[in-house]
Amino acid sequence: MSENNNDKITVKKTLTLKRSVLETSTVKQNFSHGRTKAVVVETKRRKITRTDEKAETSQPITKPHVAPQRSKPRFEEAKPSESSMAKSNLSSAEMEARLRALEEAHIQERITREKVEEQARRIKEREESLRQAVQETEIHQEEQKEEKNPPVQTSPLSSAHSSIEPIDIAITPKNITVTEKRKADEIKNDDRHSRRANPAKSEVRTPKVVKGANERRRGKLTLNSALDEEGSVRGRSMAAMRRRQEKFKRAQNQEPKEKISREVVIPETITIQELAQRMAERSVDVIKFLMKQEQMMKPGDVIDADVAELIAVEFGHTVKRVLESDVEEGIFNIADNPQKMQPRPPVVTIMGHVDHGKTSLLDAIRKANVVSGEAGGITQHIGAYQVEQNGQKITFIDTPGHAAFTAMRARGARVTDIAVLVVAADDSVMPQTVESINHAKAAGVPIIVAINKIDKPAADAQKVRTELLQHEVFVETMGGETLEVEVSAKTGQNLVKLLEAILLQAELLDLKADPKRTAEGVVIEAKLDRGRGSVATVLVQKGTLHPSDIIVAGNEWGRVRALIDDHGRHVKEAVPSTPIEILGMQGTPQAGDRFAVVTHEAKAREIAEYRQRLARDKAVARQTGSRSSLEQMMTKLQTTGIKEFPLIVKGDVQGSIEAIASALEKLGNEEVRARIVHSGAGGITESDISLAEASNSAVIGFNVRANKQACALAKTQGIEIRYYNIIYDLVDDIKAAMSGLLSPEQRETFLGNAEILEVFNITKIGKVAGCRVIEGKIERGAGVRLIRDNIVIHEGKLKTLKRFKDEVNEVQSGQECGIAFENYEDIRAGDTIEIFRIEHINRTL
């Protein structure tokens, strides 16, 4: 029996660790610094032995499948049973040495794998592929080594006594936790001491690691890996990568959009955001462009038209510059068609002194009593009426006669065709009569003199004609061209003759207008009526005005609701030279404002807003004194090219005024002269200030002062009043102001000549002529002429004047020097340089 048993024992197979009894699963762990480790969890099954093997086997230790937990798993060593220890005759020291060898091999393999992964991470483009390739290469090399080196076999002596069972150890190179690392380090240290004591002892090789089925799903995201990878960063999914590739392909295949060039309308000022919207660009792009130009701005900042044009051109757009005043283009001064012109009635203005019978004369002409309705017999507003004589119509405008309404009288003179100057035969020429003459002459309209109150016993028509000669009004009976008619508003004497004289003068003027075009005219007066609202009396000068027309008058606009004539009747249209009342204005315009018909309300509103804004700016300018000095007025006249110096002179007596006027007339020459717009004896009144504002004149007071109302009006209008009590001081100041209008005189002074001896080229300076002064002297900064063969080829200024390498101010005759010209280098030896100086001398009268 013993022999048979021994025979069976001798033929047993070599001791091996069979891997077929293990079911493996892989769990990936992440550590700091980008390191990862795959841990294999193995489940041991029952080992099945062959029937011919009578050796007693120990029950296999089954380790349950360990699911990945967030807590660190505990490491349990698989210890052999006492029976197997007794049968294998292995001491505990040998078993511990074998375990330590296995752990050391595992740790060494992990260290090697980490080094390989560290090297693979440094390669950016193929990080993951290279790391997997290195791992596969290492595993393949280990398999080849195991094929060459078979597993360690037990000695024949130990196998003869007992059969050794395979030891199933649930430890693999990939299931070591942090606790296992500490134990492995302790085992490694103990093994080093044991190796020193037993250097001849053979080492046990690490069993080969076999890739399980789960290794193929290493890069997949599973529930176990998601629970185990705490704190790890999840990578991009395949769907995200696929979307990214599709987006990149679309961007590659998409054709670039063609730049669209637009016409950008740029006003005087515009915000960056509005400019970007008009260019169809982003505000950020415009701000980036400004940042490149070293301008830090925001979308809401306002820039001027020049900067806006630069930005628009830089972005590839065309620019159309517009001004705020462009909104008024196309409403005034439209050219009339000569073929459509038709005769129109003349517009006649009744002018004259207060209480000389202007309204009474007009009332006699109209055959209607309007005098009784006036306060104190004085006309308080401009009345416009139309009468008919021999089938021809005449439009009359009655202006107030007293001095407080000088500005209204000036507006009336601007709209009239013929001025009828009413002078009382018993009162002769008065101050307001002279003002009316001046207004008529300034407007350039012909004058017809109506000598009224001829029926009175004290009437002296010849005296009136003689006094009119002093104001340059020459009537026909005195050898002039001005028509005069002796009339009586009370008795109606010669009224028909006056109307015939007006029609005769109108025939000479050949007055025509186009009634088919849009209406245009002037506001005669405006008022606010409690029942009807704003009511404006206008004079149609061109075209025909209809109800429902949209008009702009000064700073106001409105739609015509009704047209009322001078008899209070509603009419359907107003032809040229027709005075008419209009209802429907949004506000009350000023007397003298021009009106015109526009196409739609938006344009009318835009024009009115622009004019209101302009009026506010002018009011601010007056308060700051923009026109408050005589010097600024002189500068304005000089820039506009006007050579006349307008003045309004008021004195204490008529003799002083005549002396001042005579002295001022002597100051003029062929370039500039003084023009006295108005002069008179007495204090400075509101009428004088209004006339100065209308004619842009200076106000001079000689031994007189302005009253309180005139001072307030002058301050409001920004008119300066100068007072004098010595006639010579007055003349000297006016002379100095008028002298400023004269252009200065240029006088040339010869300094010397120099001859060019040699020409030198000097760095950073250019050509320098070495000269000798042969006549006079050379001064620094003087003018020079280059003469070659007695021909002047260049005239300019000196750039450099040196003597012995030093800058000098002048060089005397007989000395040598170096000369360089400004922006000119065509100089040759033998040329002659002429030096001169130009002096500007102010001219005086």
From Swiss-Prot:
Coiled coil: none
Binding-site residues, GTP: 352-359, 398-402, 452-455
Residue numbers spanned by region G3: 398-401
tr-type G domain: residues covered: 343-512
Entry keywords, A to Z: Cytoplasm, GTP-binding, Initiation factor, Nucleotide-binding, Protein biosynthesis
Region described as G5: spans on this chain: 488-490
InterPro entries named in the record: EF-G-like_DII, EFTu-like_2, IF2_assoc_dom_bac, IF2_II, IF2_N, P-loop_NTPase, Small_GTP-bd, T_Tr_GTP-bd_dom
Basic and acidic residues composition bias: residue spans: 137-149, 179-193
A Gene Ontology molecular function term of the record: guanosine tetraphosphate binding
Region named Disordered: 45-91, 127-209
Subcellular location: Cytoplasm
Region named G1: 352-359
Polar residues compositional bias, start-end: 81-91, 151-162
Location of the region described as G4 in the Swiss-Prot/TrEMBL record: 452-455
UniProt superkingdom: Bacteria
One annotated Gene Ontology cellular component of this protein: cytosol
Region of interest (G2), ranges: 377-381
Functional description taken from the UniProt entry: One of the essential components for the initiation of protein synthesis. Protects formylmethionyl-tRNA from spontaneous hydrolysis and promotes its binding to the 30S ribosomal subunits. Also involved in the hydrolysis of GTP during the formation of the 70S ribosomal complex.
Protein name, entry field: Translation initiation factor IF-2
Species per Swiss-Prot/TrEMBL record: Bartonella quintana (strain Toulouse) (Rochalimaea quintana)
